[in-house]
């Protein structure tokens, strides 16, 4: 993968004048709100999708989306990424091998107006509900490592701290040390950006785990599995379909991960709780 150009990269938050009403009083004040704009994914000169996203880390977004959607299998399959931002949006110019572009033509559709998508361009139920290769990672972490990663994730969300309007996705090593965090208005986008950042940094995603500040939908579980991340922990609940996918794909799926509490929905062998299942700590 090579980067061709990146122009006018914007901040993830903007200042707006608002009327704030508190304690029976109102005042006009300056406030920070999350930035959101349409981002067009253009492969070999042809537009594939338009996503509503936070205009930060767009190179990571381009790579992570391409990997998690199965458009390419490896980072090196992306030959050029050009990021162009303008007043009303941004475009990601992405070059992929001709055979990949031909396959993409079968999936092409415009997805304008969505804040993230994990099933983009699929035209059949079978294509959406595909089962990715099974994860065979031997990763094991302690519940303390998970709690440590959750604390670190909370502390590394500058846009969320300013605006309260974005999701975050982070990757931690087996000891719970968070290495990378990405934020976005769309939970799928945040995970895509994280996947792209991992690939750009040449970090082996299978040697750690992901934590997200959202629910764990089917699309989130699919993206984690596509990226070979063996454990996905969400602060909210998973869906039934996400659990089914995780169970069949070998993904450890955790929900309601807060402090030292959590619910493990699939493949619990990767999380050392310090007590045997059925015992009281």
UniProtKB/Swiss-Prot annotation:
Alphabetic keyword roster: Cytoplasm, Molybdenum cofactor biosynthesis
Gene transcribed to yield this protein: fdhD
SUPFAM superfamilies: Cytidine deaminase-like (SSF53927)
Species of origin: Xanthomonas oryzae pv. oryzae (strain KACC10331 / KXO85)
PANTHER family xrefs: FORMATE DEHYDROGENASE, SULFUR CARRIER PROTEIN FDHD
Main location: cytoplasm
Family of this protein: Belongs to the FdhD family.
Cellular component terms per the entry's GO annotation: cytoplasm
Active-site residues per Swiss-Prot or TrEMBL entry: 117 (cysteine persulfide intermediate)
Single GO term (MF): sulfurtransferase activity
Annotated protein name in UniProt: Sulfur carrier protein FdhD
Signal peptide coordinates: none
A Gene Ontology biological process term: Mo-molybdopterin cofactor biosynthetic process
Known role: Required for formate dehydrogenase (FDH) activity. Acts as a sulfur carrier protein that transfers sulfur from IscS to the molybdenum cofactor prior to its insertion into FDH.
Protein location: Cytoplasm
